[in-house]
Amino acid sequence: MDYYYPMEEEEEVHERPRFRRPVHPWQWHHWQNLLGLLSSSSPSPATAAAAQRCSHVSWEETAAAHLYSASLPGVRKEEIRVEVEDAMYLVIRTELDDGGDGDGGGGGGRRSFARKFRLPAMVDADGISAEYTHGVLRVTVPRLHTRARPVVNLAGGGGGGGGPACDPVARAA
């Protein structure tokens, strides 16, 4: 007598799931490839691949500062611009020559890279620093530390309190 083992049969069937998680059209990673292609002046696949290589930017938050790190291989320090727009946005831009020989051949062109970040409200825009070493740009945006509000101590007067005026236990009794 043959036995029916439904679990073994079902394991052999590999179907794609019917329902997939919906894709939100405004998520950044869906548009990142398109923006990389639009920012390059030459639509060749080599330029698009190079623009994609240059687009890794990360952000980290610490207690003292916001740290931005951009991987920009093959970019000279003179080709990088870090700007603050309207005291609200940090902009990292590069414009690269692809090494064209100037005779109109198809090998030359310009490539650009730009990322814009909205800065938090409490940052010191004048204290922003940037450093470029080994193909990695690091931008440090320090937090704006305001001094603590002064605390006023109230002195207990001798006029009928029976204890210190600021003591919550004395007031409750």
UniProtKB/Swiss-Prot annotation:
Keywords noted in UniProt: Cytoplasm, Stress response
Induction remarks: Not induced by heat shock.
Disulphide connectivity of cysteines: none
GO terms under biological process: protein complex oligomerization; protein folding; response to heat; response to hydrogen peroxide; response to salt stress
Compartment list: Cytoplasm
Domain sHSP as annotated: residue spans: 48-157
GO MF annotation list: unfolded protein binding
Keyword Cytoplasm (UniProt): yes
Domain of life of the native organism: Eukaryota
GO cellular-component term (any): cytoplasm
Keyword Cytoplasm: yes
Pfam families: HSP20 (PF00011)
Oligomer status and interactors: May form oligomeric structures.
Family: Belongs to the small heat shock protein (HSP20) family.
UniProt protein name: 18.8 kDa class V heat shock protein
This protein's encoding gene: HSP18.8
